């Protein structure tokens, strides 16, 4: 009889654990889709020079490191966009985008091809990109991103 009780308790515990993992995986999958949608919105805003949307997407303490290794704040990026110093003609993403969710933080890595200029300097080329997104009351916002040029080997 004791053995049946132990087996029953063990089975219930395993089922409960499996359900918790399933709920967490579903939450991560939903968050990943939200991040991917926000990335599309972000890229469209960059291409259309939509400062109002970028103002919402970038956190107040946002930092961008461009392919030349220069860092820029949210205010600097917006000023470059409004002045025309930053102007992108196209952004295409390779199929290798990876979105990793860690609670209210998402880390996104990918390979991108950009045509245009950043901060008044030609920036056309291929890059490895890393973006760090945080989810707060305003939804998913970009807190930091960096582009690293891909060079031929």
Task: State where each predicted segment sits.
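Sequence/structural signature of outer-membrane beta-barrel proteins
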Residues: 115-117, 150-152
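A short, structured loop/turn motif at beta-sheet edges
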Residues: 99-106, 133-139
């Amino acid at each position: 009889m004791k053995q049946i009780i132990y087996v029953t308790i063990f089975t219930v515990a395993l089922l409960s654990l499996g359900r918790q993992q399933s709920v967490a995986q579903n939450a991560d999958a939903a968050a990943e889709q939200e991040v991917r949608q926000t990335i599309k919105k972000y890229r469209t805003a960059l291409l259309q020079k939509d400062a109002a949307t970028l103002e919402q997407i970038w956190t107040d303490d946002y930092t961008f490191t461009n392919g030349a290794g220069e860092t820029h704040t949210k205010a600097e990026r917006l000023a470059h966009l409004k002045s025309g110093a930053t102007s992108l003609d196209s952004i295409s993403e390779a199929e290798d985008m990876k979105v990793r969710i860690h609670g209210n933080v998402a880390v996104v890595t990918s390979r991108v091809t950009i045509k245009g200029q950043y901060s008044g300097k030609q920036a056309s080329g291929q890059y490895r990109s890393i973006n760090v997104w945080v989810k707060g009351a305003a939804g998913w916002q970009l807190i930091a991103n960096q582009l690293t040029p891909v060079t031929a080997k």
